[in-house]
Amino acid sequence: MKLWKRAAAAIKDRKSLLAVGFSRRNSSYRNADLEAAIIKATSHDDSSVDYSNAHRVYKWIRSSPLNLKTLVYAISSRVNHTRSWIVALKSLMLLHGVLCCKVPSVVGEFRRLPFDLSDFSDGHSCLSKTWGFNVFVRTYFAFLHHYSSFLSDQIHRLRGNNRRSLEKTSDSVIQELERIQKLQSLLDMILQIRPVADNMKKTLILEAMDCLVIESINIYGRICGAVMKVLPLAGKSEAATVLKIVNKTTSQGEDLIVYFEFCKGFGVSNAREIPQFVRIPEEEVEAIEKMIDTVQEKPKLEKDEEKEDEKAMVVLEQPKKLQTIITDKWEIFEDDYRCFDRKDKWEIFEDEYHQNHLPLITMNQPVYITYTMPDLITF
């Protein structure tokens, strides 16, 4: 960024901070300190990320869900009035961190992002220089838009399930399969977020890719964990869907390796080492395929049995009733296939990656507001 552009960008940020300072009124949706932290965390500077103010925003959000109104108001105003890809991308990264706060009262309210960047276009440079950044912002927005909706739906679904005393196992399996398919769609979206132009090797892009690499590991881990849990519970009616999900998971594992290799070549720090991804055993896949074949063969067997049953049917006439005696024939299907010890492998793999804190998204730190109580007892 040229010197005069940096100066103009700094002036814009300063004006925004002054505007917040002049309107220092704390109402139900205004918090001047939080708004100032949001402006600083989404500044026009593409050479660095203000980690301290980003984490300050997260602390405000986790300390009280009431601050969500201020966040929505401030960040939507910020994004709707900007034509800078830098501000737009930093705003997306900031909201990504908010979604990772894991505060149900906050995440549950984010059914959609408070702004629309689906057709974003930078207005400060010519299109030949900014088209790659525009694509990056749009694809990142598309992922977060669906991710926020997914997380919100999960929160509300869990609340609904907790209100029910009993739930059918078949219904829970179907819900879990639908959840896995949504996670797979989200992972596909992440794999589309990457630099596509030659002039995009900038600090801010590298920071965003660091976040996305860790998020891809997180989502893929949730997919694998959910698949391993649902395999022993799935019946013959869900076998075809399960096989489709398993094949998709295997394919995404290969795509994720390619994504890591690209990120490593681009210089993303969290992709310096390509992990050994957990694969679903061939025995599991063969068991599902066998179950599907059994279901497909069953109609033929039933037709043959009907013909044999007609021959084996004996009608005994009695004075006031007819009694039908049918030969007993039972077919046993083995649904409960054993799964290998999957939990330990994945937890070790996931823990190794989560030891590297996300550059802008560090959520697993408890936040407390400490108040010093006056000593009113000492004489």
From Swiss-Prot:
Xref: SMART domains: ENTH
Broad class of the protein's primary localization: membrane
Localization per record: Membrane, Clathrin-coated pit; Golgi apparatus; Cytoplasmic vesicle, Clathrin-coated vesicle
Gene Ontology CC annotations of this record: clathrin-coated pit; clathrin-coated vesicle; Golgi apparatus
GO biological process: clathrin coat assembly; clathrin-dependent endocytosis; defense response to fungus; vesicle-mediated transport
Start and end residues of each ENTH domain: 26-158
Xref: SUPFAM superfamilies: ENTH/VHS domain, GAT-like domain
PROSITE patterns, alphabetized: ENTH
MF (Gene Ontology): 1-phosphatidylinositol binding; adenylate cyclase activity; clathrin binding
Keyword set, alphabetical order: Coated pit, Cytoplasmic vesicle, Endocytosis, Golgi apparatus, Membrane
Domain of life: Eukaryota
PANTHER family: CLATHRIN ASSEMBLY PROTEIN, ENTH DOMAIN-CONTAINING PROTEIN
Name of protein: Putative clathrin assembly protein At1g68110
High-level lineage: Eukaryota, Viridiplantae, Streptophyta, Embryophyta, Tracheophyta
